[in-house]
Amino acid sequence: MAQFSDIDKLAVSTLRLLSVDQVESAQSGHPGAPLGLAPVAHVIFKQLRCNPNNEHWINRDRFVLSNGHSCALLYSMLHLLGYDYSIEDLRQFRQVNSRTPGHPEFHSAGVEITSGPLGQGISNAVGMAIAQANFAATYNEDGFPISDSYTFAIVGDGCLQEGVSSETSSLAGHLQLGNLITFYDSNSISIDGKTSYSFDEDVLKRYEAYGWEVMEVDKGDDDMESISSALEKAKLSKDKPTIIKVTTTIGFGSLQQGTAGVHGSALKADDVKQLKKRWGFDPNKSFVVPQEVYDYYKKTVVEPGQKLNEEWDRMFEEYKTKFPEKGKELQRRLNGELPEGWEKHLPKFTPDDDALATRKTSQQVLTNMVQVLPELIGGSADLTPSNLTRWEGAVDFQPPITQLGNYAGRYIRYGVREHGMGAIMNGISAFGANYKPYGGTFLNFVSYAAGAVRLAALSGNPVIWVATHDSIGLGEDGPTHQPIETLAHLRAIPNMHVWRPADGNETSAAYYSAIKSGRTPSVVALSRQNLPQLEHSSFEKALKGGYVIHDVENPDIILVSTGSEVSISIDAAKKLYDTKKIKARVVSLPDFYTFDRQSEEYRFSVLPDGVPIMSFEVLATSSWGKYAHQSFGLDEFGRSGKGPEIYKLFDFTADGVASRAEKTINYYKGKQLLSPMGRAF
């Protein structure tokens, strides 16, 4: 067991006071949790395998602060370890464009993933543990432990009240993730006051039922020996994740300790001074770090971590010699590169090919891609036969003892846990090694995972949502399952690809974009109903996010659509010309995000000035204002019935589109029209 002495106590006091000083400097933040949690953080990081000079070393231990509001503690710890934080960075805590934002963000040194909304961090940690287990099972060889790292997380009462943590903790227990160790900061205080007002369950019994190893430390404010002993015991558990309940005092040492008042406000000046006196620091000085604390962390954490990194590098060089194929593949993944020519395996389609639901063309794409992309790891939230996310011959990611699969398997059975699936995918992506996670559910149920979807965009995790049954076209399941507002919501999220392909070629383009994406997640919305392979659909043009799929000279109107409505718009355009000699251009706009990043010249060549533009999409119209003068869509809930009959009910037919196109032309006749894309700034 690790030994602790006065230098450890000094290090903990330094952590506490640096955290308090940050909050004091900003006059904003959360001093309570750092004061109580500092001993836990010290114990974790004292044994953490990391290298601040190579923070992305693949075999490092991961640490996730799920209760991200206590990030002043994390920044203090990372500064002491020599990560790229100066004292001035700590002084700039919570200031605009600082490197120390109010909750941990991935762009800050040493921060594995953006956390803050409670419950997300522990769920991301489950994803990291899954990735590590898969990575180890794929690449480890006898005598060559390429991956044997742990994932550590700190969570609070609030994290464990959030539903997403229940989803992911349940799955982690089922998957027997012995590489996951979580510390539960039980301080009995919430923003409202005592947690007993709303939360009195036996958390450890719940986690025991999930299949976790459970432990308890009663005196977390200062009993580093017991914390360390529990951690070492947790490492012995190879077939269960571990949760260690540590009873702490929020705001330990403060005049307000043990109260809700110390949670989220700066301490008063006299309180800060008495804290510093209590722990032997000058009460009139701030951001003080004794040199012996820097030296201690360098000796106990930094130098051993550098040595382990160097030993790993030497081992990897030998590995590449002994296992050249695996070594080459692994080096490529560590470089963040894709296999040369991988895109040639994307299926191409012609108008002579059978009409297929885009969920089926998606299945063809995924089946081809998993053969050439070992970093592609997928699953579904208990909708595999509907999402068509599993390929023939797939091996499930399961504990080998269950005989249901193994840890080298790349198909994850998430169960009915959409939010958990999203947060886990974020963690898999954040693990590194170029992992490309995808997860399937109905488009409408992506809303269950809104928190994780938003954090994927904020944290820059390029995960892929395979979102089938993308409209009223799903039919009989009715309005509870039919998405209306969902795409508008997703399109409103910054840094988010939202693809709705019209046929097979556009589906291939959507996946090409999603797989190539560096720091932008993707939602691929796919139809349940069959759609024709369109005559002028283009993989290359679709990669621009929008293009002219049916053109005429001097159009009287432009119809712009996505997905299943593109073919209807083309039929409407032909009908308009055959019956009224009205000339209609049709534009397919499968991804707004990509289209918006094309040159102004290209965008205005597709949707120019001087022509009325009408959008047609059988979902909410609210996201179409910047592309169309008029929108035809569905701003009410759908109906239960056969898909084609529901389309007819709302007049979503070629005749219905043609009629509204004619009305749009007449309305704007004689008026000077600028493209809706035109903007002053």
Curated annotation (Swiss-Prot):
Q: Name one GO molecular function term.
A: transketolase activity
* Cofactor(s) for this UniProt protein: Mg(2+); Ca(2+); Mn(2+); Co(2+)
Enumerate the active-site residues: E418
Which positions in this protein are listed as binding Mg(2+)?
D157, N187, I189
Name of the top EC class for this enzyme: transferase
Catalytic activity entry: D-sedoheptulose 7-phosphate + D-glyceraldehyde 3-phosphate = aldehydo-D-ribose 5-phosphate + D-xylulose 5-phosphate
The cross-references to SUPFAM superfamilies, in alphabetical order and at most eight, read:
Thiamin diphosphate-binding fold (THDP-binding), TK C-terminal domain-like
Q: Name one GO cellular component term.
A: cytoplasm
Q: Where does substrate bind?
A: H30, H263, R359, S386, H469, D477, R528
User: What else does the entry mention about this protein?
Assistant: Present with 149 molecules/cell in log phase SD medium.
* PANTHER family registered for this protein in UniProt: TRANSKETOLASE, TRANSKETOLASE 1-RELATED
Oligomer and partners? Homodimer.
Name of the protein this chain belongs to: Transketolase 2
| Source species | Saccharomyces cerevisiae (strain ATCC 204508 / S288c)
